[in-house]
């Protein structure tokens, strides 16, 4: 876990980065909108910059630098017997394009929840998230932090919500998952072919 002083400096740096970008792309409620253009259609997401400042600043850093352009949604997980429930995961495959990992902002810290259309950061251990993120389809509250659960119970860092384009999310979720997995635990979850992310841009 990050030390309090490190976390405080990270929060200050994130707030400064967001302020430097200006408020032109913010909605009336202070959220920042990002359009994710894919080869299956567009997804419009609203980022909760006030509630998840570290996570949103990291995501917007990749957006503003163009590093998500040409990346892909490469993974789809579907609940057994409920093919429209699950998530699609995307990110950057080239390690040279990755920024340093960020501190984990749990749902207990942000007050955000994993529900239909939630954007959240993929991770391994705490403080390992870089570019990979996922979009939820259907009820996914099991991804929230749960202090009473055994083991790693910090959940995932929710940071935004799809406001348009859930039909695109579900179309990608339904694509064939016959690709070869690097991790055996992901076998049967790798999109073949992946859904290309053409570009990501702030909207407004």
Map each language-model feature to its residues.
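Cyclophilin-like peptidyl-prolyl cis-trans isomerases
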Residues: 2-6, 12-204
């Amino acid at each position: 876990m990050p030390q309090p002083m490190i976390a405080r400096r990270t929060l200050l740096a994130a707030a400064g980065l967001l302020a430097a970008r200006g408020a032109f792309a913010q909605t009336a409620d202070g959220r920042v909108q990002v359009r994710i253009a894919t080869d299956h259609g567009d997804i419009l997401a609203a980022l909760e910059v006030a509630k998840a400042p570290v996570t949103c600043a990291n995501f917007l850093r990749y957006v503003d630098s163009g590093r998500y352009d040409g990346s892909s949604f490469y993974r789809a997980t579907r609940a057994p017997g409920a093919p429209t429930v699950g998530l699609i995961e995307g990110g950057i495959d080239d390690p040279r394009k990755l920024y340093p990992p960020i501190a984990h902002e749990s749902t207990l810290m942000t007050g955000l929840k994993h529900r239909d259309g939630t954007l959240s950061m993929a991770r391994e251990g705490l403080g390992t998230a870089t570019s990979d993120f996922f979009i939820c389809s259907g009820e996914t509250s099991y991804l929230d932090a749960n202090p009473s659960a055994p083991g790693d119970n910090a959940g995932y860092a929710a940071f935004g919500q799809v406001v348009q384009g859930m039909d695109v999310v579900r179309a990608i979720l339904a694509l064939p998952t016959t690709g070869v997995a690097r991790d055996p635990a992901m076998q049967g979850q790798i999109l073949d072919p992946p859904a290309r992310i053409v570009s990501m841009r702030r909207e407004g």
